[in-house]
Curated annotation (Swiss-Prot):
One of its GO terms (cellular component) is perinuclear region of cytoplasm. InterPro entries: EF-hand-dom_pair, TPP/p25. It comes from Rattus norvegicus. It holds the Pfam family p25-alpha. Regulator of microtubule dynamic that has microtubule bundling activity. Required for embryo implantation; possibly by regulating beta-catenin. Also required for decidualization via regulation of beta-catenin. GO terms for biological process: decidualization; embryo implantation; microtubule bundle formation; microtubule polymerization; positive regulation of protein polymerization. This is Tubulin polymerization-promoting protein family member 3. The keyword Acetylation applies. The keyword Cytoplasm applies. It comes from the Eukaryota. GO terms for molecular function: tubulin binding. Belongs to the TPPP family. It is found in: Cytoplasm; Cytoplasm, Cytoskeleton. Keywords: Acetylation, Cytoplasm, Cytoskeleton, Microtubule.
């Protein structure tokens, strides 16, 4: 088997990939998407000896029949199956050690994640102080939205007769 430092690094990598993309995940179980990401990011799936399909098949083999996730023990079984396929010329133990070294200490890569742009047009379009017309009514001085009060004129239905609307506004209309 792999050295104890490799096993600790392997378990740490398992936990990091298990919680990737899921804020509610505990890190004890990994889903198929994160398993495929681990194999791709750690170069276990090279596209030649081990493909994405092989990764998915091994995941299905090691998980329980009705389960959608694997735990750490099933993860190690899956790695053993992939190790013999990835490193064909080596013994089972050497192949497992080699695959553990590929994964140990790694964490999910965020390559291809879109960053927020800050260009001239974006600044101009998102600066609420530069809005004109009815759009500037939708935000207060700090730039925070007013909600429905900024989008609609809300009618005051507080008259003492059903047809009398906007109570208290007569004096403003008729100037003395």
């Amino acid at each position: 088997m792999a050295a104890s430092t490799d096993i600790a690094g392997l378990e740490e990598s398992f936990r990091k990939f298990a919680i990737h993309g899921d804020p509610k995940a505990s890190g004890q179980e990994m889903n198929g998407k994160n398993w495929a990401k681990l194999c791709k990011d750690c170069k276990v799936a090279d596209g030649k000896a081990v493909t994405g399909t092989d990764v998915d098949i091994v995941f299905s083999k090691v998980k329980a029949k009705s389960a959608r996730v694997i735990n750490y023990e099933e993860f190690k079984k899956a790695l053993e199956e992939l190790a013999t396929k990835r490193f064909k010329g080596k013994t089972k133990e050497e192949a497992f050690d080699a695959i553990c070294q590929l994964i140990a200490g790694k964490e999910p890569a965020n390559i291809g994640v879109t960053k927020a742009k800050t260009g001239g047009a974006v600044d101009r379009l998102t600066d609420t102080s530069k809005y004109t017309g009815s759009h500037k009514e939708r935000f207060d001085e700090s730039g925070k939205g007013k909600g429905i009060a900024g989008r609609q004129d809300i009618l005051d239905d507080s008259g003492y007769v059903s047809a009398y609307k906007n109570a208290g506004t007569y004096d403003a209309k008729v100037k003395k």
